[in-house]
């Protein structure tokens, strides 16, 4: 069994960029500090509760990237 590698932070940043949203906007919505959002952008893993909050705020299923990785 191998570790599932999903560049989740980059994926979150990409969605924000596509929508013209900022780290400050996301930090206000989650809520958490803006500095923490920038740390998230550089991570390859994330707490599931935090990821769920991000999914809800952005209305985007980031969990699907892990499911796709498991199928490959």
Language model features: what each stretch is:
Residues 49-65:
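DNA major-groove recognition helix of helix-turn-helix/homeodomain DNA-binding modules
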Residues 15, 29, 40, 68:
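Residues in the recognition helix of alpha-helical DNA-binding motifs
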């Amino acid at each position: 069994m191998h570790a599932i590698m999903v560049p989740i932070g980059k994926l979150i940043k990409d969605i924000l960029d596509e929508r013209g949203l900022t780290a400050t906007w996301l930090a206000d919505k989650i809520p958490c500090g803006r500095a923490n959002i920038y740390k998230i952008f550089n991570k390859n893993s994330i707490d599931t509760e935090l990821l769920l909050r991000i999914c809800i705020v952005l209305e985007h299923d980031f969990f699907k990237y892990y499911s796709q990785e498991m199928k490959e």
